Amino acid sequence: MFLLFFIVHWLKIMLPFFAQVGLEENLHETLDFTEKFLSGLENLQGLNEDDIQVGFTPKEAVYQEDKVILYRFQPVVENPLPIPVLIVYALVNRPYMVDLQEGRSLVANLLKLGLDVYLIDWGYPSRGDRWLTLEDYLSGYLNNCVDIICQRSQQEKITLLGVCQGGTFSLCYASLFPDKVKNLVVMVAPVDFEQPGTLLNARGGCTLGAEAVDIDLMVDAMGNIPGDYLNLEFLMLKPLQLGYQKYLDVPDIMGDEAKLLNFLRMEKWIFDSPDQAGETYRQFLKDFYQQNKLIKGEVMIGDRLVDLHNLTMPILNLYAEKDHLVAPASSLALGDYLPENCDYTVQSFPVGHIGMYVSGKVQRDLPPAIAHWLSERQ
């Protein structure tokens, strides 16, 4: 730190000399960068783990089963809409992405619009969870959470809001238990996994080509799939941008503590990836990515068949136009497999996958779109 202060002081002293030899502009750029960097280092030195807070919206745990916790967010209007909304997030990341930062929280915005919002936290699987299956997650944990919400709200049905992989899970659940789902909202949810142009699908094995990973070998050898492995998979989809380029911009924001904290919150979420229960990972990768069974009507959850034609409830399909993880075509395919005369609505947003949660513009437009759509279907 002392060396950097010395460099700044020396550059200021040498400014007249550099001006004489025509390097004044270059010197000013170097000086500005160094001063910004110094200010940023001071901000970083004053931060600790507790400062990088996520999940700002007040909530209470209303049910727990094994490592799974069901939360209810504290309503902020006197009379919320009667049909509760359950957010079903993916297994591969932590659900606080929907409540990552103040001012851009999907949850907080939905609450302000009068919704009664619940959230499932799947927790962190341990070695003892290696044999958990999709049946355990969907017909077990998820179904039990739905029952608890119905009891608490005195409603026979609820609204599911499934996000990413959680959207795929919600489609499966609503197919198996249509009598418990009043409305279904899916957001950036993969449906047709046979999209070779999408790198995540190729790595998952949708073409079963040279890039396809050997799922059976992985699960048999490791049991649970490490979250660090999944982090690497996601980073390698855009290695230059995600592993290098974004960090070049950090000195520009280090002097602004609010921007720096938002960046660190995102970094915390990106690398906070739970391990995946081995058998669940095996079935999801093989049945969905490698064999595309969802749109073929061949997915089995236990001894029950998932049939998208069972989705007779109103459906809102939200997707990101610039999504590099879930291709728009993958999400849009849902409309081709629904029953005739289904109340089906599609809406897109001009952002990428993560932008659906953190873009300021999307958070101005997305929650009202969901709330308005639901208010017409109570």
Curated annotation (Swiss-Prot):
What EC number(s) would the UniProt record show? 2.3.1.-
- Compartment annotation: Cytoplasm
Report the SUPFAM superfamilies cross-referenced here: alpha/beta-Hydrolases (SSF53474)
Q: Which GO MF term does the entry hold, naming one? A: acyltransferase activity
Chief location of this protein within or outside the cell? cytoplasm
Say how it is used. Poly(3-hydroxyalkanoic acids) (PHA), of which PHB is among the most common compounds, are prokaryotic intracellular storage compounds with potential uses as renewable, biodegradable thermoplastics. Cyanobacterial PHB synthesis is particularly attractive as cyanobacteria use CO(2) as the carbon source.
Which residues does the UniProt record annotate as the domain AB hydrolase-1? Answer: 84-356
* Gene Ontology CC terms, in alphabetical order: cytoplasm
Q: Does the keyword Electron transport apply?
A: no
The broad enzyme category this protein falls into is: transferase
Give the catalysed reaction(s), semicolon-separated: (3R)-3-hydroxybutanoyl-CoA + [(3R)-hydroxybutanoate](n) = [(3R)-hydroxybutanoate](n+1) + CoA
Q: Which residues form the signal peptide?
A: none
Which keywords annotate this record?
Acyltransferase, Cytoplasm, PHB biosynthesis, Transferase
Pathway-wise, it operates in:
Biopolymer metabolism; poly-(R)-3-hydroxybutanoate biosynthesis
Q: Name one GO biological process term.
A: poly-hydroxybutyrate biosynthetic process
Protein family (similarity comment): Belongs to the PHA/PHB synthase family. Type III PhaC subfamily.
| Other notes | Nitrogen-free medium induces chlorosis in Synechocystis, leading to the degradation of the photosynthetic apparatus and concomitant accumulation of cytoplasmic polyhydroxyalkanoic acid (PHA) granules which in this cyanobacterium are composed of PHB.
Which NCBIfam families does the entry mention? PHA_synth_III_C
Assembly = Forms a heterodimer with PhaE, which may multimerize in the presence of 3-hydroxybutyryl-CoA. Both subunits are required for PHB synthesis in E.coli and in PHA-negative A.eutrophus.
What does it do? Answer: When expressed in E.coli with Synechocystis PhaE and C.necator PhaA and PhaB, confers the ability to synthesize up to 13% (w/w) poly(3-hydroxybutyrate) (PHB) depending on the carbon source; all 4 genes are necessary for PHB production. Cell-free in vitro coexpression with PhaE gives a heterodimer able to polymerize 3-hydroxybutyrate-CoA.
Name the record gives this protein:
Poly(3-hydroxyalkanoate) polymerase subunit PhaC
Instruction: Please state the gene responsible for encoding this protein.
Output: phaC
